[in-house]
Amino acid sequence: MLEADAARLKTDRLGYNPLHVLRADAATRRQEPAILTMIRSSPPMSVDSSPLPEALRHAASISRFMRRMLDSRPWLAAQLAGSLGQPLDSEAMSSFLANRGVDEARLRASLRHLRSWVVCHVLTRDLNGFADLAEVTETMTVLAEVTVRATYEVLREGLVARYGAPLSPTGWEQELLVIGMGKLGGRELNVSSDIDLIFVYPEDGDTGGNKVISNFEFFERLGKQMIQALADVTEHGQVFRVDMRLRPNGDSGPLVCSFDMLENYFITQGREWERYAWIKARVLAGERYHELEQIARPFVFRKYLDFGSINAMRALHAQIRREVTRRDRVNNIKLGPGGIREIEFTAQVFQLIRGGREPGLQVRATLDVLAVLGERGILTPQTVGELAEAYDFLRRLEHRLQYLDDAQTHDLPGNDEDCECIARAMDFPDYTSFLGVLDHHRAAVSRHFDHVFGDPSEEAHTLDSMWAAARDVEQAEPILSRLGYGDPSGAAHRLAALHGSARYQQLPNHIRSRLDALMPRVVEVAAATPGPDETLARCIDLIEAISRRGAYLALLQQYPQALRRVADLVGASRWAAQYLTRHPILLDELLDDRNLEPAPDWDALRAQMRDTLDTLEPDMERQMDVMREQHHAQVFRLLTQDIAGLLTVEKLADHLSALADLMLELALPLVWRKIKIRHRDDPAFAVIAYGKLGGKELGYASDLDIVFLFDDPAPEALEVYTRLAQRINTWLSSQTAAGILFETDLRLRPNGESGLLVTSIESFRKYQLESAWVWEHQALTRARFAAGDATIGAAFERIRCEVLRLPRDIAALRAEVLAMRRKMSDAHAGKSERFNLKHDAGGLVDVEFLIQYLVLGHAHRYPELTGNLGNIALLRIAGELGLIPAELAARCGDSYRLFRRLQHRQRLNGLLSLVAPDEVAAAREPVRALWTIVFGSA
C-alpha cells in the first residue's frame, strides 16, 4: 500500500479530492475484514454452480471477462479468496510463477495464468471500492515488470546455453536492456493495455560459445522469442500485446539496437514526437541503465527552453484528432476531444519545454508532472486540480470499459446493457447522469488544452499585409503614423531593413514563418507603449539577436502577454533591453505573474538551488551555468518589479545584495569539494564584502569588492585557501555559455594587488592596526561578513569595530580624508557642463566621505557609529549625537537618496551619471553646507 498511499498524498497536494478515493479508503478500512471472512468461508465456485461471495458476484455482474475466467479456471475463485484482502505486489506474483513453474516448457502457461489472476484480482478490488486508481495502475505495471523479467531470464538462459554469452570486444558480458515506454514506463499501465517496448544492448561483439553469432543476432533472437512468449494467443489466453513501433525507425528499423546506434539516431533523425515518447522511458530489465539515461536525457530534455515543442505537439495532436474524427470515434475517451491524451499532452509539453533546465520536471507519471507544474506556478492551482480530477475520472472509466471484455477499448459503449453497466460501475444512478459528469470533465480538459496549445498565429492580423510588403516604405509610413509612431519614416526603414536583411532571408522556412507571424504583433504592441519608436527599435534589436533560436520566437508568438511585457520592459529601459538581448533565455520569466511579487523568498531559493546543484554533482560546468541562469533570472525579476514601480532604489539594492550573498554562499562549498588537497570537511574560510556589496547598495551591474580571510593553523592552510580563493574568483567571473556571474575586485585586501590573495584572521588584525592607510579604514566602515564560516565572520566584525573605534588625531584624519577626496576628484575631473552625480562636489562621494570621516573621528566615543547601517542611518545618528546639525543631516540624507534614484534612472537608460545642474541644485546645497561645517571649506 505504500505506493498507493504516496499517490494519494500527491493527489492531496494537487488540491482536489475525488469522491471515489475517499469512498475507497473508507470502504477498505470498514469492510475488508468482513469481505475476507465472507470469501474465505465460501468454497471455490464458478458463476453458475453456486452463489459467489458478494465481492466476486458484484465484479462478475459488470465484467463478462470475469465471468468467463471464473467459469473456465476452476482454481481462480480460491486463488482470489486468498488474495483480495490486499494489493498484489511483485513478491506475490513471483511466488505464483515459482509455484507454477517457469522453465521454458511451462513459462507461457504460467505467465497467462498469472495474468488471469492479477486482472481478476484488481478489477474485483476496484469495482468493490477497495482499490483506487494508483493501486490499479501500479498492480498492472508490476505485472508487466514481473512477466517481462521472467521471460527475459528464462529465454536468455536457453540462448546462452546454445551460443554462449554475448561479449564486448574487451570480453565484458553483455545484456539486453528492455525499455518500457508509454504508460508502462510511467507506471500508469491500464488493465487491457498493450506494452510498448524497445530493446537495446550496450556494445557490438560476438557470443563466447562454440557456435558463435553476433551480439546483434543473439539479442534479436532473444527479442523475438520474448515477444512471442508474451503476445501469442494460446488456449490460456495472452499476457500482453507487444508494440515495438517506438524503436528507432519504427517497423522499418531493426528489432534491437546498440547504444551507439541509438545515440546516432537521436542526433541525426530523432523527431519531436519521439522526444515526447521517451519522457516515460524506463528500463525494466538490464543493469546498465545509467549509460542509457546519459544517451537519452540530452535528446529528451534540451539544455535551453524549447517552446518550439508546442508547435510539434500541436501538430501531433491534430493528426490524432483527424484520425479519430475520420473513423467517427468522437466518443473515444483517450484520443477524442477532452480525453486522456490531451491531459498528457498538456502536462508533458512543459516537460519538453523546461525539463532540461528544471530537473524536477524529469518525472514520468502524469499526476506527478501536474503536481510539479502547480508547485512551480507554471499552471494555476485551478487548472492543475481540474486536470487531475478529470484524469482520475477518465482513467477509472477507461478501466471499466476494459473490464467488460478485457478489450483494449476507449470507446463509450453502444448498447443499453453496457451503458447501464458502465454507469453502475462508475457509481451513477443512470447513464444520463454519468454522461453529464463526463462531459463536464472533457469540456474542462479541452478548455485547458486549447489555452496551452491554441495557435495565435492562425488568426489573421491586420498588419500582416504591411509586414509582407515591409520593403515598401512609402506604403508602411501612413500605417505607422496612424498607429501613433512619432517617426513613421524611421520605423518603416527599420522594418524594411529587417525584412530585406540577409539574416532574415537565410532563416530556415519554419523559423521565418514564425518571425512573419510575430512581427505584425511586435509593431502593434510597440505602438501601445509611451515611446513607440524607441520600443520598436529595441524590439527589433532583440528579435535580430534571437532570430535563429526558433524556440524564443515561438514563445513570443505563443504567449501574447509575454510579448506585451517585452515591449513594456525594453521601452522603459535601454539597459533592460540590452540585458534581455544578452540573456534571451529570460523571456520565460515574463510568463509568470508571480515574478511581480516584490518579496523574494531567499530561503526557498536557497533550498531549491542547493538541491539542483547537488543533483548536478560532479558536473562543474553545468553547476556554473545553473548559478548564472538563476542569478540572471532573479535579477530580471527584480528588474521587472523595478520598472513596474514596485521597488524603491534602497529596497532594490537590498535584494541585489542579498542575491549576491546567496550566490557566494552557494559557490563556496561547491568549489571546496573540488579542491583535491583539502584537509578538512568544511573550510575555515570567510568572504568579506566591501564597497557597494558591503554597504548593501549593489546595483544591476556592480562588481563585487571582496576579501578572503581564513583561520586555520594547519601548515598547508595558506596553500589550500589560496587555491580556494582562486577557484571562487574563477567561478564567479569566468565567461561560460550562460555568461558571467559577477565581475570581482580583490584589490581591497591587505597590501592590495601586491598582497596575498588570502589573509589569516590574525594577520588581518595586525595589518589593520599597524599598517593600513586611512583610506583602507574608510573602506572598512562599509565592510561586512558575506559568506563562509560564521565564526570567522564574527571575528572579523570584532576586528572591524576595534579598528574603527581607535582614537585618532582629528586634524591628521581631516587632512588625510581631504587629500584622498582631492585625489579622487582630480582622477574624475570632466569637461562636461552636466553634473556628475557621483564625483562632482556636493554629490554622492562627498556624502560618503563625510560619513566615513565622522565614523573614524568619533567612533571611539560613540561606538554606535560602527554599525553597518547604511549612509542615511549613519547621518541621522551623527545628527542625534550632536556631531552635525540634525536638520542638515536629514536634508543630506534626502539628497543622498535623490542622487541614488537619479543615478539609477540614468543607468536603466544606458546613460552616464550626468544630469542637468538645475535638476540637482537644491539637493547639492545641504551637502556642500555640511562639508563646509565639517571640513571648513566647500
From Swiss-Prot:
It is an enzyme of class 2 (transferase). Residues 460-938 are annotated as: Adenylyl transferase. It catalyses: [glutamine synthetase]-O(4)-(5'-adenylyl)-L-tyrosine + phosphate = [glutamine synthetase]-L-tyrosine + ADP; [glutamine synthetase]-L-tyrosine + ATP = [glutamine synthetase]-O(4)-(5'-adenylyl)-L-tyrosine + diphosphate. GO terms for molecular function: [glutamate-ammonia-ligase] adenylyltransferase activity; [glutamine synthetase]-adenylyl-L-tyrosine phosphorylase activity; ATP binding; magnesium ion binding. This is Bifunctional glutamine synthetase adenylyltransferase/adenylyl-removing enzyme. Keywords: ATP-binding, Magnesium, Multifunctional enzyme, Nucleotide-binding, Nucleotidyltransferase, Transferase. Pfam families: GlnD_UR_UTase, GlnE. Its EC number is 2.7.7.89, 2.7.7.42. GO terms for biological process: regulation of glutamine family amino acid metabolic process. Involved in the regulation of glutamine synthetase GlnA, a key enzyme in the process to assimilate ammonia. When cellular nitrogen levels are high, the C-terminal adenylyl transferase (AT) inactivates GlnA by covalent transfer of an adenylyl group from ATP to specific tyrosine residue of GlnA, thus reducing its activity. Conversely, when nitrogen levels are low, the N-terminal adenylyl removase (AR) activates GlnA by removing the adenylyl group by phosphorolysis, increasing its activity. It comes from Aromatoleum aromaticum (strain DSM 19018 / LMG 30748 / EbN1) (Azoarcus sp. (strain EbN1)). Residues 1-457 are annotated as: Adenylyl removase. GO terms for cellular component: cytosol. Its cofactor is Mg(2+). The keyword Nucleotide-binding applies. Belongs to the GlnE family.
